[in-house]
């Protein structure tokens, strides 16, 4: 049984685990978190994992769910000094109406420019510890000042043993299968699901994101398997359309390659390099580099890739 939030449409959010039991974690990590929830109270915690998509934010929210805490969620980038003194202080200082423990989750508090907020949080944690706990998530533990680390239980997780890896991948395959069933996505070849999990492990967030992209036609079949397993072959269709300045065809090709942008953009630059004039090589790297820089914040990755195609089609001089 998996949690389904019907208010969400992005699969990663729609099927985010809500309990520690539902989270896919190394056995030792899961026992650590279950021992915390069994006590009914959450201490000050720093959840640290250098790998993205391993579940730091999900675990933080699941801990709060499992102890029925009154949770306030804050993006680390928003947690400036005035925010700590204002909204965070107001939340932590007020008693919960129903007597529940209050917990503030500060997500990715290791970002640059937050040292002043971190220093102020030291006294904040001590002042309101009887009423409110803090959970901090961080990719880089060095981004959290030492005095703050000393006031928290630092839990570094996402480091599975070989046995853990096998079990976690099995759990993820079962989870993806359940998601496909709920979404009405036909699995014509289970090798696709297994390949998705193996390719992205331990980044389960990316795994579900790619499932969302690859399943846009409602089926996972052998045709998609070659994309997932890196057996992608040539990109002659794109190169030919770029040479011909075929904007309509380039727009049609964008969905095919948007799902694996990081591989594709490198392959595209590699292929174009030997096919254009020396003057165009510099401009090609400028265009591709800028597109790559802003890919992470693009609202629609297919349109983002189509824009790259059109720029290259208009500006490249082919040999």
Curated annotation (Swiss-Prot):
The keyword ATP-binding applies. Pfam families: AAA (PF00004), Gp44_C (PF21429), Gp44_lid (PF21328). Disulfide bonds: none annotated. ATP binds at residues 12-15, 24, 53-58, 205. InterPro entries: AAA+_ATPase (IPR003593), ATPase_AAA_core (IPR003959), DNA_Rep/Repair_Clamp_Loader (IPR050238), Gp44_C (IPR048817), Gp44_lid (IPR048815), P-loop_NTPase (IPR027417), T4_Clamp_Loader_L (IPR046388). GO terms for biological process: bidirectional double-stranded viral DNA replication; DNA repair; DNA-templated DNA replication. It is an enzyme of class 3 (hydrolase). Keywords: ATP-binding, DNA replication, DNA-binding, Hydrolase, Nucleotide-binding, Viral DNA replication. SMART domains: AAA. GO terms for molecular function: ATP binding; ATP hydrolysis activity; DNA binding; DNA clamp loader activity. This is Sliding-clamp-loader large subunit. It comes from Enterobacteria phage T4 (Bacteriophage T4). The lineage of its organism: Viruses, Duplodnaviria, Heunggongvirae, Uroviricota, Caudoviricetes. The gene is 44.
